[in-house]
């Protein structure tokens, strides 16, 4: 069994297949921004084969291709956008400056942040409507992923509290909803106030 599929052992495959099938139908453009992480590249290889979304890797193409070659990972057909050399850098620098104008971020500071961290570039692509979603956190801290999302995308209108949730699937179907739990919020607001819960 491959490393990517081994984590599915014991999981409710019907639940996962529903998610996969929805992905195959909608063909959303999903960004992954950890080109140095073998696990991310293996996941992309699996995604390319299964067609559950249109993956795009953000980061250094040479680094990604080097890791892929060394580990025997096939990334054929994958679009890789270099956040340091992208033709759209000016667009995203301007967008970041606009999003962070209350902090008086200038173009030089914005460029340093965006070229220094692919997660920020990916979040700006989502904010601009150039992608449907972004996935990170395999090797990037929750803090950095959340910061990029909050700074670049922000919460929905009339929402102040940003939160996270996790799906946990257990082999014991007598627990939760047929063995499936949704946990919120272990990553961002683990001890919410009543107002934060209401938000």
What are these regions (language model features)?
Residues 2-6:
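Serine residues within intrinsically disordered or low-complexity segments
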Residues 7-199:
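Anion-binding alpha/beta catalytic cores of soluble intermediary-metabolism enzymes, centered on
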């Amino acid at each position: 069994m491959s490393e990517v599929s081994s984590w599915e052992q014991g999981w409710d495959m019907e639940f996962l297949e529903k998610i996969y099938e929805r992905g195959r139908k909608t063909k959303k453009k999903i960004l992954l921004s950890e080109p140095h992480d073998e696990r991310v590249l293996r996941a992309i290889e699996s995604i390319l084969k299964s067609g559950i979304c249109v993956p795009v890797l953000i980061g250094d193409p040479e680094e990604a291709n080097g890791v892929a070659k060394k580990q025997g990972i096939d990334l054929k057909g994958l679009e890789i956008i270099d956040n340091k050399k992208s033709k759209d850098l000016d667009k995203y620098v301007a967008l970041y400056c606009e999003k962070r104008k209350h902090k008086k971020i200038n173009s030089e500071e914005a460029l340093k942040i965006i070229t220094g961290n692919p997660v920020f570039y990916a979040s700006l692509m989502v904010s601009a409507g150039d992608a449907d979603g972004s996935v990170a956190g395999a090797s990037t801290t929750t803090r950095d992923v959340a910061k990029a999302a909050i700074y670049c995308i922000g919460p929905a209108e009339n929402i102040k509290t940003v939160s996270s949730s996790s799906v946990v699937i257990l082999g014991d179907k007598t627990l939760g909803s047929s063995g499936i739990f949704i946990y919120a919020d272990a990553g961002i607001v683990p001890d919410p106030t009543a107002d934060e819960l209401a938000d």
